[in-house]
Regions:
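N-terminal accessory segments
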Residues: 1-39, 67-70
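N-terminal glycine-rich flavin-associated loop
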Residues: 16, 41-72, 96-121
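Short glycine-biased active-site loop of nucleotidyltransferases that positions the nucleotide triphosphate
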Residues: 38-41, 83-88
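Short helix/loop capping segments that flank catalytic or ligand/cofactor-binding pockets
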Residues: 59, 82-83
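Conserved PLP cofactor-binding pocket of PLP-dependent enzymes
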Residues: 75
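A glycine- and small-aliphatic-rich helix-loop capping segment at beta-alpha/alpha-beta transitions
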Residues: 86-100
């Protein structure tokens, strides 16, 4: 990602904070370190991390990113082993960590409905 794209994302931070809340938009270098990798050996440097709490917030972030041609990488718990949650092109990491509720467990039909930040610990 070029410098102009990086600056464009930085300009969007106030709008991202309006969408997700001040505490749920990370752009400090120390905060971003955790989001440079998952369980694989690959690394990438996001410009900003957004931690939405609702599907509406996700939709708003994606619309904003799309209208500004900014790459977005979705991240569940960051435990993947294939590098799928790595921001190789910079951009925005959309962390689903706050969306960690088990919504339904149907034992008879053997399925569960969970949010993307649920971990199996």
């Amino acid at each position: 990602m070029g410098k102009s794209q990086h600056l464009k994302i930085k300009d969007l931070i106030p709008e991202l904070k309006r969408i997700a809340g001040d505490n749920y938009v990370l752009d400090d270098q120390a905060d971003l370190l955790v989001y440079e990798y998952d369980g694989s050996i690959d690394r990438g440097n996001p410009v900003v991390v957004v931690l939405p709490n609702t599907t509406k917030e996700i939709s708003q972030v994606l619309k904003l990113a799309r209208s500004n041609s900014i790459p977005v990488v979705a991240r569940g718990a960051g435990t993947g082993l294939s590098g799928g949650a790595i921001a190789e092109q910079g951009g925005i990491v959309l962390s689903m960590a706050r969306m960690n509720q088990i919504l339904e467990v149907n034992r008879s039909d053997r399925y569960a409905i969970v949010e993307p930040g649920v971990v199996n610990l």
